[in-house]
């Protein structure tokens, strides 16, 4: 009788030591506000992304946007997403908030 070991493949999230995220408010194809958030903590990539979004929303005086399925897919594929008015509960004074990972080490 042959023995075949069972392999378990667990999806581990890679730890990044340095991450920079660029957030931009865009109105009529023009940059209104922008900011770069740098995170050198030992958190996971997901935690760093959420912490950066919290920091951006606080700095721009915005409510936190809702991550729609399209935002999640765009961010997973391109490391970039756009939060439009559909992602915010309150009215926003711009067309969209672009959130883009510009550096990961």
Task: Label each region the model flagged.
Residues 52-105:
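Acidic, low-complexity intrinsically disordered segments
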Residues 31-59:
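Short, flexible N-terminal segments of the mature chain
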Residues 14-16, 47, 90-93:
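Short, surface-exposed loop and linker segments with low hydrophobicity and enrichment for Pro/Ser/Thr
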Residues 16-36:
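Short, extreme N-terminal segment that most often corresponds to the first beta-strand
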Residues 5-9, 26, 55:
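Compositionally biased non-globular segments, especially hydrophobic aliphatic-rich helices
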């Amino acid at each position: 009788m042959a023995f075949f070991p069972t392999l378990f493949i667990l999806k581990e999230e890679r730890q990044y030591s340095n991450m920079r995220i660029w957030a931009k408010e865009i109105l009529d194809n023009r940059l209104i506000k922008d900011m770069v958030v740098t995170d050198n903590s030992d958190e996971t990539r997901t935690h760093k992304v959420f912490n950066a979004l919290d920091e951006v929303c606080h700095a721009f005086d915005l409510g936190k946007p809702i991550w729609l399925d399209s935002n999640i897919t765009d961010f997973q594929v391109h490391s970039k997403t756009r939060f439009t008015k559909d992602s915010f509960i309150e009215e926003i004074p711009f067309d969209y908030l672009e959130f883009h990972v510009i550096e990961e080490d």
